[in-house]
């Protein structure tokens, strides 16, 4: 539509450019790479298709089209084709330079330019620009030298026209950028019928002097969706090679197509051909492993990780009110695909309160993939945008996934004027993706942080992760007693008296969930040590109450109390559910929390 309507004569194809695409020609069907797919699909009367690859020659889709252009070019330049000597010096031929009619000899023929362009991308781009000038030219009688329209495909545009400040680019890079800028900014080109199509995985890698021109339109090729994957599975299973040995699946082709969400057609092909060759039944675990391997390969193991937590909500100690809330209120909204689906949530609370363990348990309770986002920023210039674009294509293809981001305040930056441009751009794109209606019901964001106040207000707004801000606080009341009994369970035999419980509760008055876990480890170590020192078979290594008290009294908690108090108050202030707050809630109580935060900030405590 863009080409036929004349909306743009300069297109950038980005995204899933390395995949296979379905084509039907008469009775034959096949899956082929992008450029062959485009040249076959658009090989119709009235068009001349030209392809330029960085490491190859300028190619014409049809030999007859090459001859047409050659004849028109030589007429236009007033030249004839001499006998071509392939052994002639290439450097001598290239000494002529680029195609500037004012400076070039008029008798340089088409074939010589085509050969000189091999391995010389600057000359190749200028020659392609000249073809467009030729297409608009007429002879002495006013007849067009070329009646067909040109469609020019330029592969690896990011290598030909790399992003970067002009002053930091090489002279050749700057020359190519200048050629292309002049080419596609020419009003005669924009108003004519020729089209140039740049192909790159990420538009952000193409120089901004080109990509930001208003006449340049970027078209993203998405990852294959459910219908495309299902079609490929059916097509492959019906190809002659597989008719005698069909795929051996654990379930239906539809189930396989659903489980392979996130895979490209190339990766899906590898999976199916490998399964066919082995003859083993393809199991869901095999598919999940392939999806995980593919996604980590695309984004990098330091960027994402597929996770299946070993524990679930039944393994959570204490936090009974929160666990009940997760089961009754949150899980139904995460698993929903309807209007009640939640876009995301924030989990906050002081360090050591058990946020990660609890919500990993939530992830383990859900029967959906959990994608852990580790570090989306890259140290390499331009790669952060590429990683994000790959991530977005992946998420658009997935059917249902939970994105788990721990230490979210360090992952996402600010969008203010003081932030780095890459950080602002990345955070802005993540925010837009969180509120994208296309992803709602398919993607749920789970952001964990002890410093909720460091998250951008734009992230925390409703419609993103501000719909639900869940505080995880230190255990109190029955929850503290549950933690205490869990801590002592392995080192003390029999029931614990109420008096002992009260004594231990006093000794552990300021303990967090992490403190109880650390104490449990210390007690188990003391128990093992006692067992090793035992000289009688009757000694089991169990600790007496006095021995337990000795271990507890020997411990000194880290000096982080004021910081944890500040983080607790911030979690209370930012919580979006009264039912998750301790005790009764009132505006007066909230105001007291705000005042306590201000007092801590005046003495330099900011978490």
Language model features with spans:
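C-terminal engagement/docking regions of AAA+ P-loop ATPases
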Residues: 297-361, 365, 393, 397-398, ...
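Conserved AAA+ ATPase small/helical "lid" subdomain
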Residues: 229, 234-292, 493-556
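Walker A/P-loop NTP-binding motif of AAA+ ATPase domains
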Residues: 1-3, 11, 25-240, 311-505
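Charge-rich, solvent-exposed alpha-helical interaction surfaces
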Residues: 37, 72, 127-130, 179, ...
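N-terminal targeting peptides and non-cytosolic leader segments immediately upstream
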Residues: 7, 17-23
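N-terminal nucleic-acid engagement/recognition segments and initiation subdomains in replication
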Residues: 1, 6, 607
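Surface-exposed polar/charged interaction patches
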Residues: 40-44, 79, 131-138, 239, ...
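Conserved ASCE P-loop NTPase core motifs with emphasis on AAA+ ATPases
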Residues: 204-205, 210-212, 280-313
């Amino acid at each position: 539509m863009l080409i036929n309507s004349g909306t743009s004569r300069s297109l950038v194809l980005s995204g899933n450019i390395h995949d296979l695409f379905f084509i039907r020609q008469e009775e034959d069907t096949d899956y082929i790479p992008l450029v062959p797919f485009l040249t076959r699909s658009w090989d119709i009367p009235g068009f001349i298709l030209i392809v330029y690859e960085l490491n190859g020659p300028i190619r014409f889709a049809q030999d007859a089209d090459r001859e047409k252009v050659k004849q028109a070019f030589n007429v236009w330049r007033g030249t004839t084709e001499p006998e071509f000597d392939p052994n002639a010096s290439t450097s001598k031929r290239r000494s002529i330079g680029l195609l500037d009619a004012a400076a070039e000899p008029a008798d340089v023929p088409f074939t010589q330019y085509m050969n000189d362009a091999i391995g010389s991308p600057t000359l190749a781009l200028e020659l392609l620009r000249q073809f467009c000038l030729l297409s608009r030219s007429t002879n002495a009688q006013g007849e067009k030298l070329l009646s067909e329209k040109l469609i020019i495909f330029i592969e690896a545009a990011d290598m030909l026209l790399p992003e970067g400040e002009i002053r930091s680019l090489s002279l050749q890079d700057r020359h190519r950028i200048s050629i292309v800028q002049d080419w596609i900014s020419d009003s005669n080109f924009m108003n004519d019928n020729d089209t140039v199509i740049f192909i790159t995985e990420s538009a952000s890698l193409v120089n901004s002097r080109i990509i930001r021109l208003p006449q340049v339109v970027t078209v993203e090729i998405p990852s294959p969706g459910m219908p495309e994957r299902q079609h490929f599975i059916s097509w492959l299973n019906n190809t002659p090679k597989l008719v005698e040995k069909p795929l051996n699946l654990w379930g239906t082709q539809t189930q396989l197509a659903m489980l392979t969400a996130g895979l490209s057609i190339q990766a899906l092909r590898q999976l199916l051909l490998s399964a066919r060759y082995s003859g083993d039944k393809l199991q869901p675990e095999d598919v999940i492993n392939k999806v995980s391997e593919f996604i980590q390969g695309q984004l990098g193991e330091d960027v994402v990780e597929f996770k299946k937590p070993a524990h679930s909500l039944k393994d959570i100690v204490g936090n009974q009110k929160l666990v009940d809330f997760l089961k009754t209120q949150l899980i139904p909204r995460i698993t929903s695909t309807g209007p009640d689906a939640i876009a995301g949530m924030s989990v906050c609370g002081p360090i050591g309160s058990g946020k990660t363990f609890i919500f990993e348990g939530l992830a383990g309770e859900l029967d959906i993939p959990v994608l852990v986002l580790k570090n989306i920023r890259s140290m390499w210039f331009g790669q952060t945008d590429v990683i994000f674009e790959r991530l977005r294509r992946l998420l658009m293809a997935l059917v249902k996934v939970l994105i788990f981001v721990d230490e979210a305040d360090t992952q996402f930056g600010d969008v203010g004027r003081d932030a780095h441009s890459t950080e602002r751009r990345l955070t802005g794109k993540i925010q837009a993706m969180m509120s994208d209606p296309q992803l709602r019901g398919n993607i749920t964001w789970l952001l964990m942080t002890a410093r909720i106040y460091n998250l951008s207000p734009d992230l925390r707004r409703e419609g993103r992760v501000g719909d639900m801000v869940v505080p995880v606080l230190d255990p109190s009341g029955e929850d503290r007693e549950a933690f205490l009994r869990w801590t002592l369970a392995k080192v003390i035999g029999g029931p614990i008296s109420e008096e002992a419980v009260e004594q231990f509760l006093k000794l552990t008055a300021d303990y967090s969930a992490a403190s109880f876990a650390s104490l449990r480890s210390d007690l188990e170590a003391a128990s093992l040590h006692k067992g090793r020192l035992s000289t009688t078979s009757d000694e089991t290594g169990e600790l007496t109450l006095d021995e337990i008290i000795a271990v507890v009294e020997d411990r000194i908690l880290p000096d982080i109390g004021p910081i944890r108090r500040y983080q607790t108050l911030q979690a209370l202030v930012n919580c979006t559910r009264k039912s998750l707050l301790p005790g009764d809630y009132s505006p007066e109580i909230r105001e007291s929390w705000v005042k306590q935060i201000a007092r801590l900030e005046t003495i330099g405590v900011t978490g």
